Amino acid sequence: SNLINVSEGGPGEDGWSIPEDSSLIVWNLPYLSPPREGEPVLEAIEEASLSDLADGGWSDLLLGELGSATVRDDCLVVMLHRTDPPSPSSPESWKSEGWSSRLLASSRIADESLEVISYWRPGSGTPPIVLEECRSTMDEAEKISEPGWQRVLSLSQISGRGRRGSSWQSKTGDLACTWLIPSNVVEEYSPGLTQTAIGAVVSDALRCNVKWPNDILTDGGAKLGGVLLEGGTGSPRVKVGIGLNRKGGSLDGIRIAGWEDVLGPSRASEVFEMVDAAVASLFEELPSVSPITREELLRISWRGLSESLSQGTHVSRSGSSVRPVGLTEDGHLILYCESGVETVDEVESLSWVA
């Protein structure tokens, strides 16, 4: 009889609060659009159970309650959202506040899409290793032996690196970060799909575009950051490096962008929280949440690329126009060209113009 206690009430009501040390919160959110002024309303109990609130909805109200509650660091929140047409209770509010999320189930009923989404704090609230300066966050991450969601960020990186051994030039105030993810993740999904999915969720968090396979660009096509995967044979974990510029400018005669161009003045810690939540949403391992599926990774990756392409990005190869039409299961780009449908796995053969 002491295992379950039931109390009536909810967020926003006097005297109601989230119980201390809560580890699981489940809510079938009311998702009917709130009635406009002059429209008929339901009975009081039906209105409370079925209709959402305006301006952020019940979801934002719960998010605010959690900000002052003393729940466990590993508390998991599971909610049912109406995502199409969009409900006031939007998953985006949780992402912007640094919560990771993963789709658990979805269903299309008539003209509505319902999704069950889980939310948690990356690393169960364990902070990253923060360095004022280092040679490379990839090298610093190599020194970490502790299990769990481990990441390193540095506000100044002296000797960063990019794809194929190229250098990644950073200025003081930029963001250089490395995450450690289990190597079996990359083995299961392939490096190509892994880095494209990461590029897609990071670009979404920063309100940018992703260029296949892993560059973060502004709407105007200027590069803001990039993603790099490294992992030795037999290593239990793979390093995911992400570099982001704070300010735009010019590098070797090429225009670059910074997060302040799209987000406005923002602290590096704030940007890291958004990116950390995005990466954890894909690959953090939780005992109570199923791993992300290959199909979901493909959907996320192609959605990110499609948003960029839908804005008029022109892609060519060897001077001839081509049209990206999809991704293979390994994250390779499928192109429609003059000779038919082809697959490419090397970005160097393509030219992207926003």
Predicted regions and their residues:
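Mobile active-site "lid"/loop adjacent to the S-adenosyl-L-methionine
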Residues: 29-61
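N-terminal lobe of the biotin/lipoate ligase/transferase fold
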Residues: 95-196
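Glycine-rich phosphate-binding loop signature in dinucleotide/nucleotide-binding domains
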Residues: 16-20, 71-72, 145-147
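Short loop/edge segments at beta-strand edges and connector loops
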Residues: 6-10, 105, 132, 210-212
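A SAM-dependent methyltransferase catalytic signature shared across enzymes that methylate proteins
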Residues: 67-71, 78, 89-104
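Short "lid" loop at the C-terminus of a central beta-strand within the Rossmann-like core
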Residues: 31-32, 82-86
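Long, positively charged amphipathic alpha-helical accessory segments at protein N-termini or as interdomain linkers
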Residues: 59-74, 79-83, 184-210, 219-354
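S-adenosyl-L-methionine
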Residues: 1-19, 24
